[in-house]
């Protein structure tokens, strides 16, 4: 090749490469809803970036503090004998130590048949990993064979008093609900002698009120108090909003924007039960003006009788690096689960669960009354038909990311009662997926960058957005719940050019669905008054709304 020819070839190559760089360097447009400047309901998008450990602003710690070894208290892996007593002794010993403490579990199989209660802050249960040479907690029998937990006394009475039963005439089933259908776990965080969830009014006790709140705007961090008592900067407290005005109370409009025909009776039959709760840190107090660390989900009106109350909780609790296994067991019926539940998180704040595999569970992780928690890299698998995998119930600013669901479950990913401003991000469901929103005043939650594997129905539809929950807690969710960059991998139905319909939701007001794509054209139906955009368009520019909002906030 002549020098002149070589120069021409190089010049052409440089032009081609510069074109590629220029193309790749172009700023791709962001979805229109991210450009909206108005606070109008039609385009309002919550800021979900406050979800997770320390509002997503700090990495989960790796330092162990004082490390104690379970083997020093009698745990012997791989010997086929029960280790429950030894594990409880190790946790008791940890409770006597000051500062950060890590209970290190050995590699191998550890047998657990009783509940391990975690009742202190700054405590981590850590295994050796989830691989072949990691740690396995094997639970050979369900919680139904454990002594009835005193913490579930109120729930047990409620189930009996209200005759809560699973009735399936076609299957000859008429059985009482299990106390473990949505509660309890073999690893159980709790504040001693503290109620977690309200079921019966006779157990109600007046909270410690620290401030009465008169007003505040949606999305703001500043609230105005009418009275303040014993409230200090740095306090972690609970903001509560009530409906004391009956069936047509103003808070119903705040939650559902008058978009649904039927609102369940629990919204007005229990006027002393807060329908909206946020666990927040007090950043500043100037006179009657209070600044909190996260934005309000709903504008506060005087009729909501809003208040800040003391909130008992644990902090800096970690559960990580092990596998929990249960034996194969036949499924009896929905709500009649025996109690193969791995982890029950209650009343924890700025805490985490990470790198855990859960096999053959009825429910992998159940939550109640938790905030600013990250659940990361959790795998659920097995042959048993689960109720829940990693569920969100009574959550605020909770992040579940990297969840992989390989097993069949009634509610694979679920925002349940009182889940608020919480996020499933970068998750994948391989079997019968449903992005469940389970009623109970859950609102402003986000399904973010989710992949699901679907076998569509014979009519070329699939109820991906089906909402569960009891009628007395309907509708399925409040305004502004969001689906962002949802990718559907259809397993069949690809032999026709007709679009496949994704549906299932008829009582989910003002949802946001942006970037629903598949390996086949889809159409989306979601009611009522949903904002639907970028269907069949991959959101390469903003694949994760949570990450996009977090990065912008932390700039």
For each feature predicted by the language model, list its residue ranges.
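Bacterial N-terminal signal peptides
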Residues: 9-18
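Beta-propeller domains
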Residues: 274-280, 284, 290-305, 309-320, ...
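Extracellular beta-rich repeat passengers
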Residues: 192, 202-206, 210-213, 367, ...
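Right-handed parallel beta-helix
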Residues: 122, 315-326, 349-360, 371-384, ...
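Extracellular beta-strand solenoid repeats
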Residues: 69, 104, 111, 117, ...
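Bacterial N-terminal signal peptides that target proteins for export
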Residues: 1-9
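Glycine-rich beta-solenoid repeat tracts in large extracellular/virion proteins
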Residues: 115-119, 135-147, 160, 178-179, ...
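Extracellular "leader-to-stem" segments immediately downstream of a signal peptide or signal-anchor
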Residues: 4, 21-106, 112-332, 507-555
């Amino acid at each position: 090749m002549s020098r002149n020819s070589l120069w021409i070839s190089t010049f052409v190559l440089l032009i081609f490469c510069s074109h590629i760089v220029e193309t790749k360097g172009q700023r791709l447009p962001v979805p229109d809803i991210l450009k909206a400047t108005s606070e109008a309901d039609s385009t309002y998008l919550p800021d979900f970036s406050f979800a997770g450990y320390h509002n997503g602003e700090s990495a989960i710690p790796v330092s162990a503090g004082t490390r104690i070894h379970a083997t020093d208290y009698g745990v012997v892996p791989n010997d086929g004998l029960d280790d429950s007593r030894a594990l409880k002794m190790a946790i008791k010993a940890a409770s006597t130590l000051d500062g950060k403490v890590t209970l290190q579990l050995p590699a191998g199989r550890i047998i657990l048949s009783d509940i391990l209660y975690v009742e202190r802050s700054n405590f981590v249960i850590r295994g050796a990993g989830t691989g072949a040479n990691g740690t396995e907690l094997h639970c050979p029998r369900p919680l139904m064979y454990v002594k009835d937990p005193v913490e579930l006394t109120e729930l047990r009475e409620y189930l009996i008093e209200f005759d809560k039963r699973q009735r399936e005439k076609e299957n000859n089933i008429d059985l009482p609900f299990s106390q473990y259908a949505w509660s309890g776990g073999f690893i159980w965080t709790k504040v001693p002698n503290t109620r977690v969830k309200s079921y019966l009014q006779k157990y109600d006790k007046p909270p410690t009120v620290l401030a009465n709140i008169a007003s505040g705007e949606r999305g703001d961090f500043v609230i105005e108090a009418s009275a303040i008592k014993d409230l200090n900067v740095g306090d972690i407290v609970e903001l509560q909003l009530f409906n004391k005005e009956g069936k047509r109370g103003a808070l119903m409009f705040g939650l559902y924007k008058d978009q649904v025909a039927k609102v369940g009776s629990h919204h007005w039959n229990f006027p002393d039960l807060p329908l909206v709760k946020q666990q927040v840190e007090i950043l500043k107090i100037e006179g009657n003006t209070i600044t909190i660390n996260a934005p309000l989900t709903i504008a506060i009106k005087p009729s909501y009788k809003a208040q800040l109350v003391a909130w008992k909780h644990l902090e800096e609790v970690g559960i990580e690096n092990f596998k929990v296994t249960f034996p194969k067991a036949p499924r009896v019926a929905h709500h009649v689960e025996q109690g193969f539940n791995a982890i029950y998180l209650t009343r924890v704040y700025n805490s985490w669960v990470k790198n855990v595999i859960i096999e053959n569970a009825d429910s992998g992780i159940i939550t109640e009354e938790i905030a600013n928690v990250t659940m990361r890299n959790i795998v659920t698998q097995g042959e048993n038909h689960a109720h829940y995998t990693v569920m969100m119930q009574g959550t605020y600013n909770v992040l579940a990311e990297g969840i992989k669901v390989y097993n069949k479950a009634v509610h694979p990913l679920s925002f349940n009662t009182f889940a608020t401003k919480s996020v499933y991000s970068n998750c994948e469901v391989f079997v019968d997926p449903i992005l469940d929103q389970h009623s109970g005043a859950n609102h402003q939650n986000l399904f973010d960058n989710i992949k699901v594997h679907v076998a569509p129905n014979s009519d070329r539809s699939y109820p991906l957005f089906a909402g569960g929950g009891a009628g007395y807690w309907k509708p399925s969710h409040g305004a502004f719940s969001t689906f962002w960059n949802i990718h559907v991998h259809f397993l069949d139905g690809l032999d026709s050019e007709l679009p496949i319909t994704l549906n299932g939701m008829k009582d989910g007001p003002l949802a946001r669905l942006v970037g629903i794509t598949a390996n086949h054209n889809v159409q989306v139906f979601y009611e009522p008054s949903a904002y639907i955009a970028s269907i069949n368009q991959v959101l390469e520019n903003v694949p994760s709304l949570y990450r996009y909002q977090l990065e912008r906030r932390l700039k």
